[in-house]
Regions:
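Juxtamembrane intracellular "pre-TM" segments in multi-pass secondary transporters
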Residues: 2-14, 202-230, 413
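Hydrophobic core of transmembrane alpha-helices in multi-pass small-molecule transporters
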Residues: 25, 93, 105-131, 233, ...
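Short amphipathic helix-loop junctions that connect adjacent transmembrane helices
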Residues: 36-51, 245-264
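Central cavity-lining transmembrane alpha-helices of secondary-active solute carriers
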Residues: 54-71, 270-280
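Helix-to-loop junctions at the C-terminal end of transmembrane segments
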Residues: 66-78, 278-293
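C-terminal ends and interior cores of transmembrane alpha-helices
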Residues: 88-111, 302-315
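C-terminal transmembrane helical hairpin of 12-TM major facilitator-type secondary transporters
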Residues: 292-338
């Protein structure tokens, strides 16, 4: 916190964090209801696994480009309007995607036009919704001092994790009424979240008080920050490669129908989210008081890598679910630890910028992970995406061991 942040009085600080937590949770719920249905929906539309990967790549490409822009903009005009705009953009893009998918299911659109419009909707969503994550992280940083930063990032991680717990299961239930129903639900939930943020969140950053804008928005990317950003990008690549192919993997290995797949995948991902949220909400807070982020990062890589290799060998429901639980534990340790390491490496005026850079790193992983994962699944083998992801995590562990990145407290600015 600094003089330029608009910190609520102590009596309202807890409420402000709770409202921000709920905002992130509801937004993530709206996104995660789609996880179980993307595979079955794509196959019903006549699209290949590789084409399905382009939906996430288009979305994340725009997030990669625009996340730093929105992060810096939140420094100049305030966090709240940028966050609300991102949530509205999320809603509009999902509504458009659902309408186009419905037209495709009815045979109204040619396959080429259908694919182009679906990818276009994802491009639009990536541009607008990329404002949400960096702004939410920066708002939480505004509300906490440096000593509590890791715990605060764990709270954000718990909000994401809880969204992942309830979202996939809810998506599986909603898919009983039609494969596009979860997409419409996400669009409506995005509008509700935007309204919640608009009416209840207080501004945490005084507009116009940011540090002078740098000519190069990547000027912060130096020293240990580069290492943390590389880990963010590649661990996300590994994770998203799994997420993008898991519905295909479950359907093909367990020999499920299109109707059965969303329910089974939803249950598995709900377990994944439950474990992740339990670690982020319960274990990260006490661990972060005793261990630095740079000590927790290798632990997360080891656990998540073990889960990926186990998943590549899994062939029945419970071994798949157990492997996903391991991946969830590793991800729950890595995510908030990386966010905390980055946040603690810059001064208070640079929180929005570094959050934007981290969102770009995450988006870079989300941009490449789906294409690699679906490409390996379609062209090499059903197990290849998870072996590849495990190898990436082992390589990152070697990088950490060699580079030994440390959080360096910056000079006040």
């Amino acid at each position: 916190m600094s003089a330029s942040t608009l910190t609520p009085p102590p009596a309202h600080l807890g409420r402000a964090k709770l409202i921000l937590f709920l905002t992130i949770f509801v937004a993530m719920l709206g996104l995660s209801v789609l996880f179980p249905i993307f595979g079955p929906l794509s196959r019903q539309l006549g699209l290949s696994e590789s084409q399905t990967g382009w939906f996430s790549t288009a979305y994340s490409l725009m997030q990669f480009v625009f996340s730093p822009i929105w992060g810096a903009r939140s420094e100049r005009i305030g966090r709240k309007p940028v966050l609300v705009m991102g949530l509205i953009g999320f809603s509009l893009s999902f509504g458009l995607f659902a309408i186009v998918a419905d037209l495709g299911l009815r045979g109204v659109l040619s396959s080429t036009l259908l694919f182009g419009l679906l990818v276009g909707a994802r491009f639009l969503g990536g541009i607008l919704s990329s404002a949400t994550l960096p702004t939410a992280q920066a708002m939480m940083a505004d509300l906490t001092d440096r000593g509590n930063r890791a715990a605060a990032m764990g709270l954000i991680g718990a909000a994401f994790g809880l969204g992942v717990i309830f979202g996939p299961g809810l998506g599986g239930v909603l898919a009983n009424f039609g494969l596009t129903v979860p997409v419409y639900f996400s669009a409506g939930l995005g509008l509700v979240t935007a309204l919640l943020a608009r009416l209840t969140l207080r501004e945490t950053r005084e507009p116009g008080t940011s540090a002078p804008a740098a000519g190069n928005r990547f000027a912060l990317a130096r020293g240990p920050i580069v290492v943390f950003l590389v880990i963010s990008a590649l661990f996300t690549l590994a994770s998203v490669g799994m997420e993008q192919t898991i519905s295909f993997y479950v359907q093909d290995n367990l020999h499920l129908t299109v109707a059965q797949t969303p329910q089974v995948v939803g249950g598995m991902l709900a377990l994944f989210g439950l474990i992740s949220a339990a670690v982020q909400g319960g274990a990260i807070r006490p661990l972060s008081k005793k261990l630095s982020p740079t000590m927790l990062i290798p632990a997360g890589l080891i656990v998540m890598g073990a889960g990926m290799f186990a998943l590549s060998a899994a062939s029945v429901f419970w071994t798949m679910a157990g492997s996903l639980a391991l991946i969830g534990i590793g991800s729950a340790i890595l995510g908030p630890s990386l966010s905390a390491a980055l946040s603690l490496s810059v001064n208070e005026h640079q929180q929005g910028q570094v959050a934007g850079l981290n969102s770009s790193a995450l988006a870079l992983g989300r941009m490449t992970g789906p294409l690699i994962g679906t490409g390996l699944y379609q062209s090499v083998s059903h197990h290849a995406p998870y072996i590849f992801s495990g190898g990436v995590l082992v390589a990152l562990l070697a990088v950490v061991a060699l580079a030994r990145p440390q959080v360096r407290t910056p000079a006040p600015g």
